[in-house]
Structure formats: C-alpha cells, structure tokens
C-alpha cells in the first residue's frame, strides 16, 4: 500500500483531477511546485501535506480532509489565511519566510505546534489556542 508520495524539485504540474491512493498518508511537493490547489480532492487518509519553497497560491477555499494533522508551507507562501477552514485534526502548522498574516486567523482548537520562520510583526493581538504547546519564530523576530 502506497503511503508516501514525494514529488521532486522540478515538479510543477496541475494536480486537479488526480485520484490519489486511498492509503496515502504523506504528500510532499518539491521546491518548484506552484499550482492552484483549491479544486484538489485530497486523499481521505492523508495526514501530512508539505509544500515546497515556491508554493504561493491561495488556500482559503481548500477542502482539507479531516485526517490532516500537519500542514507545511514553504518559503514563498504569503497569502492571507484568515478565511481558511482548517481541519479540526490539525496539530502542526508551519509557515516559511515570506508569511506575514497571523492576525484574524481562525486556528484549530487542537493546534499544538506553530512555526512562523521569519514573522516579524507584533503578536499582542493574535489569539492563540489554549492547546498551543510550541510556538517558534525565526531569528528576525523582535516584537
């Protein structure tokens, strides 16, 4: 049973209409992938989805499966996520160096780990879920 698919660095093709293996648990896209994903039907059992360095597409209307526990967005991702309907199962969320949109974000109640690699804006008005155990900011954070 296929559980992991890892697309190489140069992969940058549409994944709309792809029928994923039902057993898929881990899906990773290489550094050049930058295709729209709002219409993608994700595998029902996928737990971890990782986007590479150049991914920078809106995700506000993505229908994430209930099984997702970890989402990782690469360096270029910089779209607002305040309208994203995160799955309740999401425990780990990672954003890369270009992400600057924490205010107004609806975070899942079970989120335990949040990484914002180069976030450097005030966080005094950011609402953190009670479940959060690990919060990481990069070296440039000074607020």
Model-derived regions, located:
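Leucine-rich repeat
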Residues: 1-3, 20-26, 42-48, 64-70, ...
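Concave beta-strand-loop units of leucine-rich repeat
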Residues: 4-13, 28-35, 50-57, 72-79, ...
